């Protein structure tokens, strides 16, 4: 197993999402993907939580590169169907790079 250190930077979400309350979830996810913003999901069907960055995006699903919240290292990749997301938390943190 390799441990990857994740370099992050605090960001101002209002600059990226000036009117987030009027945006569709797909628009929010796309901006998170484009800007490598950390996200936190809760699944309605599986009652599970996932935390990480979006590696791939389309209008129906995303591929999430999961980060362990305790250790801060990548642990898995998950496919998430957008309509199954019950809660989406957008963090004010952007991933700048990953040291290998």
What are these language model-derived features?
Residues 49-56:
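Short beta-strand-centered aromatic/proline hotspots
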